Amino acid sequence: KYIAEGVDFRCGYKGSTDVSSIKYFAESNGVKYDFVEPVYYHIAAGEDERISSSYIRSMVLKHFLSTAQELLERPYSVQLEFESGVENKSGGMSFLKSRINQVLPPCGVYYCIVFQKEVRVEITEQEIIIEPAESSNLFDMANLKSEKVFVIEFQ
């Protein structure tokens, strides 16, 4: 068991849980912990931004997926459950945005990776539509739904 947080981390009701609370909890429960100094991302000459989950979410919302990928050191991804989607006639699936708890990029068309294959992802005001780039369908790609969850990697 291990916890790593920033030196200025706060959470809980009115930010009542801080690093001293985490340290006490960790020591009381045999959990290893580290508190790390902030890390900054160089935006432009003389301008740095502190890297945080809030900053990464803002990059995704602004459609700066390459910046989000650079900050995460991996593609930005969204996890979806098969049972929350509806299969469509073209072998793809549709998901209501209201059932997705992760931040999504703005409405538009994206080429992404699902099950190591390229897919076309269309994000509308109401839903996410995933269409295979090949003549297969997502259920085939997932070995007939043996996977309950899949991940969309935005490239």
Features from the language model and the residues they span:
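Classical nucleotidyltransferase
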Residues: 1-92, 153-155
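Phosphate/ribose-recognition catalytic cores of enzymes acting on nucleotide-derived substrates
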Residues: 75-78, 83-155
